[in-house]
Amino acid sequence: MPELPEVETTRRGLAPLLEGRRVTGMTVRQARLRWPVPAGLPDAITGQTIRAVDRRAKYLLFRTPAGTLILHLGMSGSLRVIPGQQAGACAVPPGRHDHVDLRLADGSCLRYTDPRRFGSLHWCTGEPEAHWLLHRLGPEPFDTAFDGDRLHRLSRGRRTSVKAFIMDSGIVVGVGNIYASESLFRAGIHPGRPAGRVGLARYRRLAGAVREVLAEAIAAGGTTLRDFTASDGRPGYFAQTLNVYGRAGAPCPRCGRSIRQRRIAQRSTWYCPGCQR
């Protein structure tokens, strides 16, 4: 699943190609995604100019004067801009999993592809931050509202694992399975430790590790494991620097002990039994 760095990489690739462009039409070939594509979406967005391409958590926000298109890539979704197309339709024929085309006045086309169809498109005419998908989300990991003190305060009395705790989007957004494992390794915290038994100093270290890991992943263009490529088709390269994720049995880069794998909160988890306590 594309996580925050992958979605931010997509946003950065799309913004200069879409901002200031007028939408001339929308084709929906498959409306049955995680939630059905709103029947009125093509009419609502046609004629609108995309003012900004933003991100909130793992959602892309295409802001126009009339409303905001909120898009989630789901498990395997991707977006790419096909340049210089014929008027009225994308010149590149759609493939089996190309479900939505957004046509632009300069002849280009934004194409949404989703083999597993777990993504979604929504139209919001009010403040998108108040939309039911977004209004309960926690702070962004790079916001000043996110720090170790917040983690420590919200974790008191919680018996859930610290890994599940930092993956809770109500606590902080964008820390998915890959980056939770990597952040906990950097902070030296065992992923199965109860969240309420992690002290303030360690939470401050963990908050810093989360920011570092996510910033490095964004700079590397995300992590390509199976489905993800950036909007220009290039893979992400953060996978080349993973310390524990997906490395069961390999030596820890710090202490040399074998990386272990176990399921925590229904998710595969990797950690070093020597470095993480």
From Swiss-Prot:
Protein's UniProt keywords contain Metal-binding: yes
GO molecular function term, any single one: zinc ion binding
Signal peptide: none
Superkingdom as given in the UniProt entry: Bacteria
GO biological process, one term: base-excision repair
Cofactor requirement: Zn(2+)
Annotated PROSITE patterns: FPG_CAT, ZF_FPG_1, ZF_FPG_2
UniProt binding sites for DNA: H97, R116, R158
Matching InterPro entries: DNA_glyclase/AP_lyase_DNA-bd (IPR015886), DNA_glyclase_Znf_dom_DNA_BS (IPR015887), Formamido-pyr_DNA_Glyclase (IPR020629), FPG_cat (IPR012319), MutM-like_N-ter (IPR035937), Ribosomal_uS13-like_H2TH (IPR010979), Znf_DNA_glyclase/AP_lyase (IPR000214), Znf_FPG/IleRS (IPR010663)
The organism's taxonomic lineage, starting at the top: Bacteria, Pseudomonadati, Pseudomonadota, Gammaproteobacteria, Chromatiales
Function: Involved in base excision repair of DNA damaged by oxidation or by mutagenic agents. Acts as a DNA glycosylase that recognizes and removes damaged bases. Has a preference for oxidized purines, such as 7,8-dihydro-8-oxoguanine (8-oxoG). Has AP (apurinic/apyrimidinic) lyase activity and introduces nicks in the DNA strand. Cleaves the DNA backbone by beta-delta elimination to generate a single-strand break at the site of the removed base with both 3'- and 5'-phosphates.
Record-listed E.C. numbers: 3.2.2.23, 4.2.99.18
Native organism: Alkalilimnicola ehrlichii (strain ATCC BAA-1101 / DSM 17681 / MLHE-1)
Presence of keyword Zinc-finger: yes
One Pfam family it belongs to: Fapy_DNA_glyco
Subunit and partners: Monomer.
Cofactor note: Binds 1 zinc ion per subunit.
Catalytic activity reported: Hydrolysis of DNA containing ring-opened 7-methylguanine residues, releasing 2,6-diamino-4-hydroxy-5-(N-methyl)formamidopyrimidine; 2'-deoxyribonucleotide-(2'-deoxyribose 5'-phosphate)-2'-deoxyribonucleotide-DNA = a 3'-end 2'-deoxyribonucleotide-(2,3-dehydro-2,3-deoxyribose 5'-phosphate)-DNA + a 5'-end 5'-phospho-2'-deoxyribonucleoside-DNA + H(+)
Zn finger intervals (FPG-type): 243-277
Family, as annotated: Belongs to the FPG family.
Record-annotated membrane-spanning stretches: none
NCBIfam families given in the database record: fpg, PRK01103.1
Keywords (A to Z) from UniProt: DNA damage, DNA repair, DNA-binding, Glycosidase, Hydrolase, Lyase, Metal-binding, Multifunctional enzyme, Zinc, Zinc-finger
Protein name: Formamidopyrimidine-DNA glycosylase
